[in-house]
Amino acid sequence: MYKNLIKILIVTLFTLIPNLSIASAEISKIINNYNINVIFLRHAIAPGYGDPNNFKLGDCNTQRNLNFEGIEQAKMIGNYFRINKIKFSEILSSEWCRCLDTISNMDIGKWKEFEGLNSFFQNYSDKSLVTKLLYKKLNTIKDEELILMVTHQVVIAQITGISPSSGGMVLYSTLNGKSKNIVINYK
């Protein structure tokens, strides 16, 4: 009896709270059930906060970068997508080194840098330009596509209202603007 009550409460909470985190979710079912066509992925673990004052785009020595744990996390994320047979129509990444290193270490296919995913947290990129480019891209995504976007917490929050942790995913539908924060144990 209590097990059924708990199940009902969980289902009710999931229905009432659209951005509820889901541990070890069956991502393919969620993608299909919620018409998801974008997966926003926050870069893997890069210790620290923001970027150094001498930040220069394209120069990883002037940026906050992945540590060993972040590199391993990126590899596990890539393995997760492969194991779950999740294929992407397109893979895009912020031009920041920690995002490029995340997607490189995931090793899931060809990808392109996209200015519309760059961080505007410390004004190293123009927020209005980044947002304009990203919305323009989102408006061109077809219903049947699935696009992976490797980016930053501020960019994901700007679009979805959700702030994922490093290596966290937010599933997003351009059809209805709904999003789901997904917490996965990649191990």
Residues of each region from the PLM?
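Active-site-proximal alpha-helix that buttresses catalytic centers in soluble enzyme cores
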Residues: A25-E115, F120-N123, I162-K180, I184-K187
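Bacterial N-terminal signal peptides that target proteins for export
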Residues: M1-L9
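Bacterial N-terminal signal peptides
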Residues: I8-I17
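A short, structured loop/turn motif at beta-sheet edges
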Residues: N139-E145, T174
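Short, well-ordered beta-to-alpha junction loops that form the rim of enzyme active sites
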Residues: S93-W96, V150-V154
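Generic beta-sheet signal
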Residues: I36-I39, E145-T151
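Sec/Tat signal peptide C-region and signal peptidase I cleavage site
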Residues: N19-S24
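Short, surface-exposed amphipathic charged segments that create phosphate/polyanion-binding patches used
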Residues: S125-K132
